[in-house]
Amino acid sequence: KNFRNEGMDRTHNPEFTAMEIYVSYKDYNWMMDFCEQLLEFCAIEVNGTSKATFGQHQIDFKAPYPRVTMAEAIQHFTGFDITGKTEDEIRKAALDMKIPVDDTMGKGKLIDEIFGEKCEGNYIQPTFITDYPKEMSPLCKEHRENPELTERFELMVCGKEIANAYSELNDPIDQRERFEAQLKLADRGDDEATAFIDYDFLRALEYGMPPTSGMGIGMDRLVMFLTNNPSIQEVLFFPQMRPEKKKVEMTEDEKAVYTILKANSPIALEELKAQSGLSNKKWDKAIKGLTASKVAKVEKTDESLMVSVL
């Protein structure tokens, strides 16, 4: 189980289920092969076929899946090539695309905003987005062919990410430098940047970590797509529910006042009091009880105090 103190919508829940897998002496290429085979197997087990209907889409989980780099995806949908661009150039491009960005965002966050706004929703069939810029992936190993990139992929289905994987960064010196870069972003006001250095993690890497690939799959979203459920609340054991309205218990005096109010709402406070025939003490107690129980409210107008039913 995972928890993130973030918002809720049809595909997000603060508490969610994830499957994580780590395999020594493998890389993200191996993990992509494993991921697509796993999801094809899951689709067949659930539906008897690799195809699953989700809303108006028919999703085919049969392997292999297309593999598109982050730079290729952005260039395809926006015409802008992020390769070799500076932070200022990317920020200007984002603003030209009418994407709301600000000066607190570093290069990685800017690229993430462009991809999220212009590209992500277009990938309906399972597609691996690969080779993320280093600034977007502080825990991911540097790409073997391009030091500006990392060996990372995310699997997109129906315009949503359902898997995220790396060739894990196991170099403690490189990892420390990434943490320090995150601190600088946090100082600029980036609320998603890591605001501390995890010295315990660095010490563990110094003792030695073999080449490793790791992946996390959002199981709730995967179940949504395999079972044609449009809301994540439909696939959770304990979904978020509206609080049940408690039945209001009224005294006999409150019932008498409420009966008059319900038939005449809104009504002047003095008129309601007169019709109730209650003594001052009983009247005060009854009207206070009704307003405290949120079944009635008193509002001041230019002419008098008015009472109405809620």
Model regions: which residues?
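Metal-assisted phosphate- and nucleotidyl-transfer catalytic regions
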Residues: 41-162, 179-211
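Class II aminoacyl-tRNA synthetase-like tRNA-binding/catalytic domains
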Residues: 1-30, 40, 118
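Short amphipathic alpha-helical interaction segments
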Residues: 278-292
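Hydrophobic residues on short alpha-helical segments
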Residues: 254-261
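Active-site pocket scaffolds in enzymes
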Residues: 172-245
